[in-house]
């Protein structure tokens, strides 16, 4: 859990913004959404495999786009 110490003479809004930013960096909200419901191990493996496949295809598309000559 991210901790933000409020500095002297610091407005509450600024401290809240820093806290939200640190939560976003730490991935707290995405972790909460992921753990909201129980995910069977088979579903988890399936989701991770699909994500890996998507990353791989994206990487291949980037490499192929670099090789295409525009002239």
Curated annotation (Swiss-Prot):
Pfam families: Ribosomal_S21. InterPro entries: Ribosomal_bS21 (IPR001911), Ribosomal_bS21_CS (IPR018278), Ribosomal_bS21_sf (IPR038380). The keyword Disulfide bond does not apply. GO terms for molecular function: structural constituent of ribosome. It comes from Alteromonas mediterranea (strain DSM 17117 / CIP 110805 / LMG 28347 / Deep ecotype). Keywords: Ribonucleoprotein, Ribosomal protein. This is Small ribosomal subunit protein bS21. The keyword Ribonucleoprotein applies. It comes from the Bacteria. One of its GO terms (biological process) is translation. Belongs to the bacterial ribosomal protein bS21 family. GO terms for cellular component: ribonucleoprotein complex; ribosome.
